[in-house]
Amino acid sequence: KGVATLKGQVSYALAENSQRATINVMLDGTILSKNVAKKSGVTVNTNGTTTIHAEKRISFDKNGFTTSPATAKAATKLELGSIDGPSSTHESIAKTKFVKGRSVNEEAASQLSVDSITKEMDANVLELLGDVIDGYKTKIRDPLLRRGGFPEQFSTSSTKGFVNLQLLQTGRYQLAASSEPPALNKSTDVSLILHESLVRNFTEVVLGGVELTDEKLVEHLTRFGAEIPDELKIGPGKKSWAITFSNTQPISVGFRNNQIVIAIQGQQFRDGMRLIKEPIRIAATYNVEKTETGMRLQRDGDVAVDFLARKTLTVIQVATKTVMSKKFNALFKDDIVGQGGIKLPGQWENAGNLILQQLVANNGWLMLSYNLDKPSK
């Protein structure tokens, strides 16, 4: 019989893998044990010290997350504490047996530690990743596959310094990048390089023909912790409204000359009981710049609301345009200022904020790169 306590440290390290992004979870620790053996009236107390190193590999590719069984190496050293027997002869025999069997018992103790730690590590990692594994499958991969919107190319890889994710979203009649992306400063910690065609191509599959109601919009904004402007609030005294996204270009973005254009295109609008079956484009243009505290987006004028098939508007169409202009001017704020970088979520919160280092919005490309600003101790 005995009691064992483990003191250790968990660390993470990226692994070289050209086929999928891979990270090693590592545990380095020391197990201190106190053991008591009783036989033929003799009580032997021993102390054990086991150093252990365990690893478990986690990988991610387009199919989701996979893990390999945990592995471990351990080394145990046993020391004789005390022997209590009915006579000195009994105690001497017990000591001799301990010395002769020490190496075998140390090996057995090491194997016991390996079995225990690897089993526990497998269970803990599975519990930790359970929601992530299920969430990727049920909320991202499966819905996109059902709608035919899963990226044509979805590749991941990792080196000892970087994790890379490359996506290509395209169809037979969809657009693609016509120019090379801007040069990236590879010394930064996190980077995003996005071509405007990805947003258009992706939303055509995911949002084409989908209706967005006022209630759903408020639900989405609330989920992301955004403030609900008065023009978008729902409830008594508020007229309901909805937009049905177009099958082509439901949401598009443009990156030109340090400007970002965000556009929504609908094929049908509802304002209360009134239904407008006309294609309308709603667009906001932002001037974007890097500041000392992050990124600033300043809207260039009001949100534009245009009936695409009309040069002159009827009274009802003018009223609809006015309603949509008020609502989307409230949605697309006129000045968005980043302060102090991007705060990491959950258990990564204490790691520090991501501070913007590079910002390019030009020639169809958006590039953002960040460094992790570690908090002062």
For each feature predicted by the language model, list its residue ranges.
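Extended, low-charge, aliphatic-rich alpha-helical segments
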Residues: 1, 92-300, 307-377
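Post-signal peptide N-terminal segment of secreted/secretory-pathway proteins
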Residues: 1-66, 98
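Generic preference for hydrophobic/aromatic residues in regular secondary structure cores
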Residues: 12, 51-53, 58-59, 72-76, ...
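Short, charged/polar low-complexity linear motifs in solvent-exposed/disordered segments
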Residues: 40-42, 84-86, 314-316
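Short charge-dense sequence patches
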Residues: 54-74, 79, 230-234
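A short, surface-exposed interaction/processing loop segment used at functional sites
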Residues: 56-58, 298-302
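Short acidic, glycine/tyrosine-flanked loop/strand segments centered on an H-E-D-like triad
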Residues: 66-98
